[in-house]
Swiss-Prot record:
A Pfam family hit: Ycf1
InterPro entries: TIC214 (IPR008896)
GO biological process: protein transport
Complex formation: Part of the Tic complex.
Homology family: Belongs to the TIC214 family.
Gene: TIC214
Originating organism: Ranunculus macranthus (Large buttercup)
One Gene Ontology cellular component: chloroplast inner membrane
Name listed for the protein in its UniProt record: Protein TIC 214
Amino acid sequence: MNINNYSITLILLIKSNLVSSCMKIINSVVVVGLYYGFFTTFSIGPSYFFLLRARVLEVGDEKEISATTIGFIAGQLMMFISIYYAPLHLALRKPHTITALVLPYLLFHFFWNNHKNFFDSVYTTGNSMRNLNIQCIFLNSLIFQLFNHFILPSSTLARLINIYMFRYNNKMLFVASSFVGWLVGHIFFMKWVELVLFWIRQNHLIRSNKYLVSELKNSMSRIFSILLFIVCIYYLGRMPSPLVTKKLKKTSKREERGKNKEETDVEIEKISEEKGTNEQQEGSAEEDPSLCSEEKEGLDKIDETEEIQVNLNGREKTKDEFNKEKYSKNSPVCENYDLDGNQDNFELKKKEKEKKNIFWFEKPLVTLLFDYKRWNRPLRYIKNDFFENAVRNEMSQYFFYTCQSDGKQKISFTYLPSLSTFLEMIQQKMLLCITEKRSYEESYNNWVYTNDEKKKNLSNELFNRIAVLDKGFLVTDVLEKRTRLCNYENEQECLPKIYDPLLNGPYRGTIKELYSRSSMNEYLIPSIEDPRDTIWINKLYDIFPTDFKELKKKKIGKRINEIKKKVFQWSYKLIDDLEEEEEEEETTEDRGIRSRKAKRVVIFNDNETTKNNASNRDQVDEVALISYSQQSDFRRDIIKGSMRAQRRKTVTWKLFQTRVHSPLFLDRIDKIFVLSFDIDRILNFIFRNWMVEVTEFKIMDSEEQKAKKKDKKKKENERITIAETWDTVLFAQTIRGCILVIQSILRKLIVLPSLIIAKNIGHMLVFKPTEWHEDFEELNKEIHVKCTYNGVQLSENEFPKNWLTDGIQIKILFPFCLKSRHRSKLQPEDSLKKKGKKQNFYFLTVWGMEAELPFGSPRKGPSFFETIWKQLKKKHKKVKVKSFVAVKIIKERTKWFGKVSNEKTKWVTKKVQFIKKIMKELTKRNSISLFELKKVSESNSNRNKTEKFSIISNKMIPEFAIRIRSIDWTNYSLTEKKMKDMADRINTIRNQIEKITKDKKSIFLTTTTDRNIRPNKTSWDDKRLEQSKIFWQIVKRGRAKIIRKCNFFFHFCIEKICIDIFLSIINIPSRNIQILFQQKKKINDKYSYNDETKKNPIHFISTIKRSIYKTTNTSNKSQILCDLSFLSQAYVFYKLSQIQVSNKYNLKSLFQYHGTIPFIKDKIKIFFGTQGIFNSESRHKNFHDFGMNEWQSWLMGNDQYQYNLSQTCWSGLVPQKWRNRINKNLANSSNFYFYEKEPLIHYEKEKNYAVNSLPSRREKLKNYKYDLLSNKYINYENNSSSSFYGLPLEVNQAHAILYNYNTYNSEVFDLSGDIDFRNYLREDYDIDRDQNSDRKYLDWRTFNFCLRKKRNIAEWTNIDIGTSTTITKKIKSQIHYYQIIDKLEKNKTDNKGFLNLAIYKQIDSANQTKVFFDWMGMNEEILNWSILNRELWFFPEFLLLYDAYKIQPWIIPLNLLLLKLNINEKQKGDLHISYNKNKSLDLENRNQEETQQPVRGDLGSYVQKENNPGSDPLKKQTDGKEDFDRSNIQRNINKKKSKSNIAAELDFFLKKYFLFQLRWDNSFSEKIINNIKIYCLLLRLKNPKEIAISSIQRDEMSMDVMLVPKATTFIKLRKRRLLLIEPARLSINWDGLFIMYQTLVILQVHNSKYQTCKKKINVDNKGLIESMARHEILFRNRDKNNYDFLIPENLLSSRRRRELRIQICLNLRNFKVGDRNREFSNENSTRSCDLFFYEDKNLDVDIKKILKFKFFLWPNYRLEDLACMNRYWFDTNNGSRFSMSRIHMYPY
């Protein structure tokens, strides 16, 4: 086995090493370079033309091919080198390089190749390559390779360069490997080209067509010239000519200065958003993120820039047109700012250096030819708010710079640009100073040394303060105070915190500048006692100038040095169309920016004349909107004179194409059904016929709706396309407008009147009445209204402004329709209602037709002839009806005659056929004489008289004829003999057959003879036949009845079978439960001892159905019999949980610890010794008595602050506000006394054992005995309550053991009554409600308020489990008794009601004491009970749990099941909630009563009647708390007396828990949304839906006002599910609240699973006790020897405390100077923060100092400090990236 294990581990190691090595190889520089170089092969440039031309045409000349290839490779090598070498990169990537070099070279090469016959129509086939020498070929390939790629340009690859160059240190290796990768790809490409050429040469079709080959060879030079010409045009499009560009007007200096005065000061240094304060600026300015330079060559190419001048006096001034100044506001004034004292000499040296520059002419020449300030590149115009002119878009978000951090030189990607600029200026001016550079080791050691010194100083200071505290000094004298800025020492009038410069953190704020005299008087001179002093003050203001803005900046800033930085900026001020329209003054300047194509749509015109001044013309007020074009805008925000950006990613193939997109998004567009692979649609199409008819109709309806939507969308797109097409074509709007006007005139004056005339003339010809008046009256109703291009109507006579250029629409109101006949005016109302509303307007089209929408498809109007055709159809129908009878009679007569004639013809044909047949037979046979026939018959008749009739019947009729022809006597004898023989033979055969049949039918012949003899009498056979007939008739009738009733019969049988099966299943538990109870009783009797306490497990809900018959309660101890057939499964699980089995393994983990045995009592030692758990030797050893240490208790069990709060309240605390309050209380307190030992606050520790699944329950049952034993000795010295702080140094008297399955008490909704924390809870406190967190909250998702009336709703929020049990000294055994009481309404109770049975309940009619057992409030009166028949359920008791399950689906801690409340409802309806104490009974008394109980129903617990209610020994101790809780609950209930129970219940929850939201149904929303909109319009509010919900929630908006019935209330709306209560799906605030909560959760990790035994260590806590003496005054009723402990590090200030923690956590000596990258460092070598806790498990046993140090180190790992370290060290402030598990010891 060991060999196999070793082999498996070896294989795993080899595999892991292979995987890691493969990952390293893949991420290496060489592999990435090869990958990048291989993909650059697909980027094809113009040099490939020369390469392919040489391969195709110059097959024989190897030198020229090699020269082309070498030049091609050399050019690509230069491109790769330019990646690494910056000067070459700048030379090749200058903006004018391609314009100055590439275009002339391409044009020269193009014309030079074709100079001989460029204008000829026929090109020569001579090889132009032979005219060039090898050098020219090499240069062509080299130079063309440097040009930009135009096929598959490598923009993505260029971005990859920047990524990998920043990632890897060995850049040259990356360049070399990328070149090798490109070379490999190039070789593959050339091989592929050779294979293609070889295939072309070997192809028989091409070789056979010699003419095609010759033409191809002759035209190769022409093809090459054309391609080269296309490349030239392509580059000309990319880079326009620098000389022919549109010049723009520059802004004047006066405008610049005037506008600069209006600009506000720019604060460049960013303010920290977390603290919200302005930190001190260090004389440097941080530029806007958009001002960071992306390309450093921009500093050299731009001469006209703006200079940001950071002066130290705090104001901004304008130097000239291109220079601006920025100042840091809070920096002190420094007049003599000279770093090296030789600034003048530095300026002289700089000028001399510029004179020595040889290429001084380069900059003016480039500026002259290529003016970068012209808008000749497709750049966006980006306007900056800080500057009036636009800043070039050449900035980056990050700024990289090297800095020294942690004693090492590092690269920071968020370095302040202002600091780097300032540092560069200092380095330039410090020419004389020579600084020595230290090595990395030396600088790092120096940094470590300084940090060690800081740590030692802080540690010594802390130890000194602790030593002073131990000597007995007060805490106020030892604590480090904050330094404040005060006026006088005695008065101690300090500045406000917001203005105090010595404070930091949240106290700091911005100081507002004072400008007016009133504000200066208010701040500088807050109170003036003598009013005469104000006069002198005013005089002082008049003498001295106070308006500092008017002072000239030159006088102030003469001796102030400036920090300047060049900023890319344009010298033009450009505006677009919108800005031009917004300008109040008319500007003569042209718009410089091309705006998006739009139109001004006038919505409203108001023509009003001014009555006051008649000379003024009409004032036209227009309300207009801007309508943008639907087509793609390729010139938006582009400066006039610049070229369009080439959109390589979008494809347009239509004149007008909506939603232009890239081919990458083809999957988003609508697909064709044939080409798409939509599985749902295909399956729907295939299996459509297999569906049910109803679903088929639904599918058809949905498909029809989809088809309609699709058609509507298609028509809308077509309409927009037509509109945009008209708007795109030049002069199209003018032509269209004129055509529309002409069509309107023709329609109104010519077309329609001519139609009316023609119609009436036709009526006259047909002798019908004419309708001249009606037609012309309808024609006059038609109105043609002029509209804008978008269909906004203006008036009938007014044309829209600029309608010839913008377009026009003509709207026809009440359009005329020519009718053949006008109907009468008096029409019935029903016919008018059936018609419905008809659209009374249309838009005129270009073709004179009508459309419903502008540019819509023309409609099909009612036709004139259609009505005539309908009338003709009606007349035709009338004629048909009249002639229908005659036609019917004629048809019937013709049918009858046809039938008769057919019958006659058939009869005649039959007769004819019969005669013909007879004739044929006569001709065939010879006739026989009558004599012969007679003779034969006589001879035959003599044989047998009985056969007479058969012979005669069988004679042949055709032979009865007489022969006419002559007889041949010679042959006649032979034929006659033969005939006679045949006749004899036939007769014999017939006779035999007749005999056989005669024998068979003899019986029937006799019956017939009898009948003939007795015809009046019926025989027996006839009677039997009649009886059988009657029987079968009866059978048929019964069969019909059975067929009718079989369906009901089958149903009856099935129900009978199902009922039998269900009854048998239900009776299974009743047959088996007795066995379980007997076994349980045996086990309990076996393990019960008089000196041992029995367990008190948690009872599951066990509701048993009451027997149907009534039980009479004659005495107090009468029993209620129960029917065990309705036993719940939960009760079975409960009884199984009580089975006691001694398992040593469960206690193994507890007793492995060597310090366990001294804590165990002698009785328990003896018991476990008999079980073999303990060794007998260790039982009698006496060890030193250990106790629980206060510090250790506080460290291991307590949360951060010692207050009685739940985790919900802790998560809602504001940390800073809390700490300030606590520190203030500590600092201001001066009375410290300590007389009694009692806890600071009774804190009830929480531990949530959630019963969420069956395995979890089994695990709890498995560790049941272990938890019981450990709980006994954890709380060995504790009182009745399980307060964690009740762990004294002295040993109290031993009490009985209480085990409530958990070792603590908990509250469902922890509303702390000890301290009011409402001031410390944030209002916007929210948590993520979708997750099932550890915090207990009310789940509103499935809460059904209408399901039941909750009497104990107030107590749900304050369930107290701690007082649910009581203990006495005499009791050695204790048990809880629970019952469930669900009372139905009196009018609803009957024999079928489900009443929960109290197990072994003893009812005291006079004074009844009950112990309740409640699961999330099931002891309630159920109002809305379902109508279902619950007899068919297996376990009807589970129906009672259904609603409780919906509220909290089996995720409830077990300790929440106990609810000790007794609710008594008075007749007046007032609720009185009282507590019932658990009655502890002696084991002997219980055993005595146990003998008196019947055997049946031995299921649970007893409740003993107690005559004396005050017999409980601990009742007096709990009276105070009970009264307090009862008064609070009663106070909350009394407030709601005026409301109903449900309303009071809802208000109670809404006041305390606001973490929910209301949501209404769509139907309900539609009803009231109109009313809400009216309110919103009146109140000028937004978001009507949110306002409605919040208003309803705060009762600000009454539901009676809405469009719903007045009787509708909030409860009814919830019942009808119109208003739904949902959990508030809010996001988590990643702030101090979350950090505080996470801190508390992390601290509970070691205590959440199991409690371990505690030890006593004697520690001197004299000073600590004295410092905490003041708290005993606040809490006197607590247990003794419970303390609150001061954290030693709190003696220091918060800043010093954080500094000390960081110094401790740094562990500087373990640092490595090398690389910190995770991929190259060993992660196992880093030590995590938990080494202080887990490195040695026996630290708390050895010495006191280690324990003190461990307690002292505990706060160092709080999450809030680590968050600060994460923010400032790792430069990430996003909370989502912060994880406690990923933070290790620094460095990270």
